[in-house]
């Protein structure tokens, strides 16, 4: 294994702001890791994700110090369109990423923009739809699907680009617990089958505790905790505005720390 993401002494503040949104971030992520990033609202999670695919500083302007390297490339120097074939990003609201008339067209959009031959585009579309279990939705309009189905389509559209990393910013924010768990299990399956590096921003720690290889807790723009779920979830996370999964919470109470 080697570092697919390497961040050194990263600081960032948005244009017009005196406050640093990210402060002194040092982070290495290995190829094939399933990493959960969590923390209270406004702690810098989304901003960190934007740094991974070049949206910062190439789209969101501001002052950036330090370095962000993904798959050996400096994201501040590589066009966002090229980075998109390496780092795929899925947002909270899947409908914001789906704008074609059919599921098939949405999934084909990325590979088409890579300039791939038609037969390769078709192969990738078929593969991505099959991997996500949504081949039966191929000719449906994305906007008549359920939230869970839409999120699967959004993930399939990213997967068709065959990225090395998929970054998901609270992808189940609008989904019920059952549908959320199905999405998380799907991500773990893709992580295992494809050795796909998964970076998941999430508050639903109860649902992802058993899936993550690693949990990163952010607070006030900094990484304050970084370790395995076993190491992180037995700590008192309430100081960071978080609740650990129920079993570690019970352990804390029995140990006199909760």
Kindly give the residue locations of the regions a language model identified.
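Conserved ABC transporter NBD signature motif
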Residues: 61-73
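Conserved ABC ATPase "signature" region
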Residues: 119-136
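Conserved ABC ATPase signature
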Residues: 141-145, 149
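Conserved catalytic motifs of ABC-family nucleotide-binding domains
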Residues: 162
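H-loop/switch region of ABC-family ATPase nucleotide-binding domains
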Residues: 202-203
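Conserved ABC ATPase "signature" C-loop
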Residues: 220-221
């Amino acid at each position: 294994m080697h570092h697919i993401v390497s961040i050194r002494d990263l600081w960032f503040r948005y244009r017009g702001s005196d406050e640093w949104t990210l402060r002194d971030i040092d982070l290495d992520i290995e190829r094939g890791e399933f990493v959960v990033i969590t923390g209270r609202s406004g702690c810098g999670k989304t901003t960190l994700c934007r740094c991974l695919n070049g949206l910062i500083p190439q789209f969101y302007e501001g002052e950036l110090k330090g370095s962000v390297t993904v798959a050996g490339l400096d994201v501040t120097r590589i066009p966002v369109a090229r980075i998109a074939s390496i780092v795929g990003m899925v947002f909270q609201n899947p409908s914001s990423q789906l704008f074609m008339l059919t599921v098939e067209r949405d999934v084909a959009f990325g590979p088409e923009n890579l300039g791939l031959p038609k037969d390769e585009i078709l192969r990738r579309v078929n593969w991505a739809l099959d991997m996500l279990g949504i081949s039966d939705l191929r000719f449906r309009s994305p906007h008549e699907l359920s939230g869970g189905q839409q999120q699967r389509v959004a993930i399939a559209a990213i997967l068709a680009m065959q990225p090395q990393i998929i970054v998901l910013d609270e992808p189940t924010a609008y989904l019920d617990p059952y549908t959320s768990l199905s999405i998380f299990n799907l991500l773990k399956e893709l992580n295992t089958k494809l050795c796909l590096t998964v970076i998941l921003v999430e508050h639903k720690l109860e649902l992802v505790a058993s899936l993550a290889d690693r949990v990163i807790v952010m607070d006030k723009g900094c990484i304050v905790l970084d370790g395995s779920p076993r190491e992180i979830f037995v700590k008192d996370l309430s100081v960071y505005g978080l609740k650990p999964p129920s079993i570690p919470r019970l352990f804390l109470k029995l140990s006199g720390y909760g």
